[in-house]
Amino acid sequence: MSMQDPIADMLTRIRNGQAANKVAVTMPSSKLKVAIANLLKEEGFIEDFKIEGDTKPVLELVLKYFQGKAVVESIQRISRPGLRIYKKKDALPKVMAGLGIAVISTSKGVMTDRAARQAGLGGEIICYVA
């Protein structure tokens, strides 16, 4: 059976992995998942990520903890296959008054809400991370 929402699966694996104090989580890889993982690493929400395998690539995320607590407090899917959420550049949300990030898929690639505002781009709101 095929997976309906691979991005929601990725976010759930991160949430469950940190709840269980796992060092790393693995999942099937895709270009969008790698772009999201790269953003999470740049923003300091995960330690690192790597892609393994050629025929069926697997994405491994190394989770980050601070003083025994997970760095990611909440991770929430916003736009989903059944209900896509798009926002214009002036309507992009601020997550936790700027402490968290919104991952936005724009015409120039996947970026944070801050970067999209600076570039003057709107797009699909993939998820919130705080």
Curated annotation (Swiss-Prot):
Disulphide linkage map: none
Keyword rRNA-binding carried by entry: yes
CC terms in the record's Gene Ontology section: ribonucleoprotein complex; ribosome
GO molecular function: rRNA binding; structural constituent of ribosome
Keyword list, A-Z: Ribonucleoprotein, Ribosomal protein, RNA-binding, rRNA-binding
Keyword rRNA-binding attributed: yes
SUPFAM superfamilies referenced in this protein's UniProt entry, alphabetically: Ribosomal protein S8 (SSF56047)
Biological process according to GO: translation
Matching InterPro entries: Ribosomal_uS8, Ribosomal_uS8_CS, Ribosomal_uS8_sf
Main function: One of the primary rRNA binding proteins, it binds directly to 16S rRNA central domain where it helps coordinate assembly of the platform of the 30S subunit.
Family of the protein in this entry: Belongs to the universal ribosomal protein uS8 family.
Subunit structure: Part of the 30S ribosomal subunit. Contacts proteins S5 and S12.
Name used for this protein in its record: Small ribosomal subunit protein uS8
Organism the protein comes from: Serratia proteamaculans (strain 568)
